């Protein structure tokens, strides 16, 4: 990407220098290891208390991340990443692969030579390399604000969440009956985080010239960022419907270039992979099916278009027996036939401008 090469050092028993992460081998080996397992549905949740935005922004200004690996060239702006994996260990909501998801995504980004200058990793498993803290509600809100704070043109942001997703009754939203929610590890005590608040903290104030890519591997995630454009297919009685980027909301326009890839539709559950032998010959690890397929596409050597990335991910899931359908939405009408990239501004479909 832009000629940059990462020179990360290894972690764990092979650590060469503290503070440097190498997850390329983890991500590659992970693909040797998936059969669908049933995700426990949390059920609709009560709306949480409203976020204290002033306190959240103040805490964000006191926060910082770390550089995960060395890069050979300096990007034009800051390149920040926030990775959240929640397994809910020893609870009724327990999942088994969400922390694997974020390690696999970080490894895929490293293999693509994505020049991260600062990252934060929130995980409820202590053995995740570079872990910043636990994915509590307060921490997630704090670092969502950290990711977006003081963003300037040419900055590149990346966000990944793997965990439970659920719904709460919508409030003051003419477009939806429900609000989608992500689920912190302490949701029983402190509640979920609704999509309106994620949009307000992470997206709404980003200036023109900033690029954000967000991945949500969770149930009910199709419109998690409430973005105005999405890839949709029109159905027709004769089966000749058309597919493309179309405006799905008349509000929530933002200046930044924001891309969201979500594991499934708002009314679907996101499945996990317990043992990836459905994808490859052997293995034992677990993780989110959408993350698994998406990172597999991202790590391919040949170039992909935006549409290729989405369609191939969908096809890979379907061919292995998964029923969920990943979604793509954006702040602007992306020209999906252009080459996929995590950096730079979107090539736009002029007919929708």
UniProtKB/Swiss-Prot annotation:
Q: What is this protein called?
A: Inactive metacaspase-4
Q: Which InterPro entries match?
A: Caspase-like_dom_sf, Metacaspase, Pept_C14_caspase
Keyword Methyltransferase part of the UniProt annotation = no
- What post-translational modification does the entry describe? Palmitoylated. Proteolytic cleavage by MCA3 occurs prior or during secretion and requires MCA4 membrane localization. Cleavage is dispensable for secretion and parasite growth and virulence in the mammalian host. In vitro, can be cleaved by MCA2 but specifically cleaved by MCA3 in vivo.
Record gene name: MCA4
Briefly explain the null phenotype. Knockouts in the bloodstream form have an initial slower growth rate in vitro which reaches wild-type levels after several weeks of culture. Knockouts in the bloodstream form have a reduced growth rate and virulence in infected mice. RNAi-mediated knockdown at the bloodstream stage results in a more severe phenotype characterized by a growth arrest due to a failure to undergo cytokinesis.
A Pfam family annotated for this UniProt entry: Peptidase_C14
Point out the coiled-coil segments of this chain: none
Its domain of life reads: Eukaryota
Q: Where is the lipid attached (N-myristoyl glycine)?
A: 2
Question: What cellular-component terms does GO give this entry?
Answer: ciliary membrane; cytoplasm; extracellular vesicle; motile cilium; nucleus
Q: What is the effect of changing residue 219 to C?
A: Restores calcium-dependent auto-processing activity and catalytic activity towards substrates
Q: What is the lineage of its organism?
A: Eukaryota, Discoba, Euglenozoa, Kinetoplastea, Metakinetoplastina
- Keywords from the named record: Cell membrane, Cell projection, Cilium, Flagellum, Lipoprotein, Membrane, Myristate, Palmitate, Secreted
Looking at the UniProt record, the site noted as Cleavage sits at: 64-65
Show the stretches that span the lipid bilayer.
Answer: none
Q: Which SUPFAM superfamilies does the annotation name?
A: Caspase-like
Predominant location category: membrane
Role, per record: Inactive metacaspase which plays a role in parasite bloodstream form growth and in parasite virulence within the mammalian host.
